[in-house]
């Protein structure tokens, strides 16, 4: 993880740690001139590691985004941001996306009153995300919310911290994406691969 954040910069979904300010400068001096391919590859890797996806999963999302109406890059980011594990992370119910993924796979999370154990579940507007009524599930979320620093909640989500309940209001707007990334470079990377 630390090698990844040192090379690619801060990845809030992967870890809460930040690279030291001097390490960025050292990397640029050591590496010399960066090729266009390397720039595209680094943007793609940033996206992949932040959301915790395999190469195959990311490629699948790029294909879905390419077939949808609108800008491929914007649609790609919307698809990734509306994943259940990412929504839990953005609501502050988990400190990282891998932590949120673990909550989902261990069946602690309900969507609209039904257990969902698939982290890639695509949330829709008006979905209600809650924890199971079991004490252990509530305790896990309580630990996460108490320990994690509270960032500003995106406007497409609302949370009720007392009932451990989150609501998806709408599809995310591009300015609320939690990662600084040039999504067009990712799309270009894949368009040149095929």
Curated annotation (Swiss-Prot):
Localization per record: Plastid, Chloroplast
Gene3D superfamilies: Ribosomal Protein S4 Delta 41, Chain A, domain 1, RNA-binding S4 domain
Any one GO molecular-function label of the UniProt entry: structural constituent of ribosome
Functional description taken from the UniProt entry: One of the primary rRNA binding proteins, it binds directly to 16S rRNA where it nucleates assembly of the body of the 30S subunit.
Main location (coarse class): plastid
Keyword terms of this UniProt record: Chloroplast, Plastid, Ribonucleoprotein, Ribosomal protein, RNA-binding, rRNA-binding
Name of the protein in question: Small ribosomal subunit protein uS4c
Record family assignment: Belongs to the universal ribosomal protein uS4 family.
Organism taxonomic ancestry: Eukaryota, Viridiplantae, Streptophyta, Embryophyta, Tracheophyta
S4 RNA-binding domain location: 82-143
Top-level taxonomic group: Eukaryota
Record-linked HAMAP family: Ribosomal_uS4_B (MF_01306_B)
InterPro entries registered for this protein in UniProt: Ribosomal_uS4, Ribosomal_uS4_bac-type, Ribosomal_uS4_CS, Ribosomal_uS4_N, S4_RNA-bd, S4_RNA-bd_sf
Pfam families attached to this UniProt entry: Ribosomal_S4 (PF00163), S4 (PF01479)
GO biological process, one term: translation
GO cellular component: chloroplast; small ribosomal subunit
Subunit: Part of the 30S ribosomal subunit. Contacts protein S5. The interaction surface between S4 and S5 is involved in control of translational fidelity.
């Amino acid at each position: 993880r630390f090698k990844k954040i040192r090379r690619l910069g801060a990845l809030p979904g992967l870890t809460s740690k930040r690279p030291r300010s001097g390490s960025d400068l050292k990397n640029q001096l050591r590496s010399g001139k960066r090729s266009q391919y390397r720039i595209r590859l680094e943007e793609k890797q940033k996206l992949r590691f932040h959301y915790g996806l395999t190469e195959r999963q990311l490629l699948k999302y790029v294909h879905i985004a390419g077939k949808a109406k609108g800008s491929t890059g914007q649609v790609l980011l919307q698809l990734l941001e509306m994943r259940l594990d990412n929504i839990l992370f953005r609501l502050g119910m988990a400190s990282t996306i891998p932590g949120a993924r673990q909550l989902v796979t261990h069946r602690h999370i309900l969507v609209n009153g039904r257990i969902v154990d698939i982290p890639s579940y695509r949330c829709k507007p008006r979905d209600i995300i809650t924890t199971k009524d079991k004490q252990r599930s509530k305790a896990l979320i309580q630990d996460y919310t108490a320990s994690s620093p509270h960032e500003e909640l995106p406007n497409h989500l609302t949370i009720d911290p007392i009932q451990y309940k989150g609501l998806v209001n709408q599809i995310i707007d591009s300015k609320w994406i939690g990662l600084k990334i040039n999504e067009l470079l990712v799309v270009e990377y894949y368009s040149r691969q095929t």
